[in-house]
A protein has these predicted regions:
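N-terminal auxiliary segments of SAM/dcSAM-dependent transferases
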Residues: 1-138
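Conserved beta-strand signature within the Rossmann-like core of class I S-adenosyl-L-methionine
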Residues: 282-289
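Short alpha-helix
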Residues: 270-271, 296-312
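Conserved SAM/SAH cofactor-binding pocket of Class I
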Residues: 158-243, 249
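A short glycine-rich, Lys/Arg-flanked "PGG" loop and its adjoining helix->strand segment in the class I
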Residues: 267-281
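SAM-dependent Rossmann-like transferase core, predominantly class I methyltransferases
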Residues: 102-175, 179-181, 185-189
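Class I S-adenosyl-L-methionine
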Residues: 304-351
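Mobile active-site "lid"/loop adjacent to the S-adenosyl-L-methionine
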Residues: 245-270
Length: 352
């Protein structure tokens, strides 16, 4: 570790970072932020390459391999940015000039800090950004209300999959499960639609706490029962079981990665293989998932259909919607062709 200050130039910081040297900042907080931004601009692959007018970003012929290389580049970028450290005093407080008050954001994310520590500046900025999401909330048209994600919980900024859940006709049932509830947004939609009893599960204690606060604030806390467990409530059945698993197979390296990447499709396959044992007679499962993995060559449609059949299930229906989020229409995205072709679907699954 090397102690550095405002005199450190970005090119020198990049050289130190690529050599594996961590830099403990002792200068001005805002100058540290500027240095972090400058360091990010120097990392190869940090920004899309400039193209001539009308030229689109296109991956190579093996889009799946391109995507994994892209993830590796982003992982390297994250490691290099994490080399800039800032000191924290107990509480915590950032022990630098012109530093913001971080006590509320840090305590909400990690609890009180009993002794001095050092943390990557980019991690601290992530904590502060997440706290703003928690305070302001995310507008969810399907609820006509807001959801307030906690640190480590995925913000439901894409509304199309929630619209599918809100608009699909409900089966005749009084009980539903929401598997992997996260912020509680799907459980809230089901409760608002008139399901008498919703059991929402998640393995993460952060998610359970986040969902509990959201459901109470939305006035459905007495309808939704939260259970911290892996996948299904043990020994229970419902007429409707909903699951919105992470959409891409791949390793999850951060808390937020866990909402996007499903290692070896574990959660998707666990939902399919366990669904029959947790459906009431006449019940159905709703699998809410994007086909982006198929567009990227990470999974085939035949694989998904094979897993459904192997689980003793059949597809009773499917409702599709085309995403309209920013990255779906961004020609500078390195995977624009895949993202622009993406479809999000609600698969209705019943016993075969």
């Amino acid at each position: 570790m090397q102690v550095v200050d405002d005199t450190l130039k970005a090119e020198d910081a990049y050289r130190l970072a690529t050599r594996g040297t961590t830099m403990l900042w002792s200068g001005d907080y805002h100058n540290a932020r500027q240095l972090l931004s400058a360091l990010g601009r120097r990392i190869p692959g940090a920004r899309p390459a400039k193209r001539s007018a009308g030229q689109k970003a296109e991956p190579g012929p093996d889009v799946g391999a391109d995507f994994y290389r892209h993830r590796q580049a982003r992982s390297r970028r994250s490691r290099l940015l994490a080399s800039i450290l800032v000191p924290l005093a107990p509480g915590p407080a950032v022990d630098l000039r012109r530093a913001p008050d971080i006590a509320q954001a840090w305590t909400h994310a990690h609890g009180r800090l009993p002794e001095a520590a050092v943390v990557p500046l980019q991690d601290l900025l992530g904590v502060l950004g997440a706290d703003q999401w928690r305070i302001r909330g995310v507008s969810v048209p399907a609820l006509q209300d807001t959801i307030h994600p906690h640190y480590g919980a995925f913000a439901p900024v894409r509304g199309e999959y929630l619209d599918l859940v809100a608009e699909q006709p409900l089966p005749e049932t009084t009980t539903a499960f929401d598997i992997g509830t996260g912020t509680g947004v799907i459980a809230a939609i089901l409760a608002r639609r008139g399901i008498n009893h919703v059991i929402a599960t998640d393995l993460s204690d952060r998610a359970i706490a986040c969902a509990g606060e959201n459901l109470a604030r939305l006035g459905v806390g007495d309808i939704v029962e939260l259970e911290q467990t892996d996948m299904f409530p043990a020994g229970r059945r419902a007429g409707l079981v909903v699951c919105n698993p992470p959409w891409l197979p791949g390793s999850a390296n951060t808390l937020l990665d866990q909402a996007v990447y499903d290692p070896k499709s574990r959660m998707l396959r666990a939902f399919l293989t366990g669904l029959l044992a947790h459906l009431e007679p006449g019940g159905e499962g709703w699998l809410v998932i994007s086909d982006l993995a198929e567009q990227l060559g990470l999974r085939s449609r035949d694989e998904l259909l094979g897993w459904i059949a192997d689980a003793g299930l059949r597809v009773a229906g499917r409702r599709d919607v085309k995403p309209t989020h920013r990255r779906a229409v961004d020609p500078d995205d390195p995977f624009h062709s895949a993202r622009s072709a993406e479809i999000t679907s609600l698969w209705r699954l019943t016993p075969a």
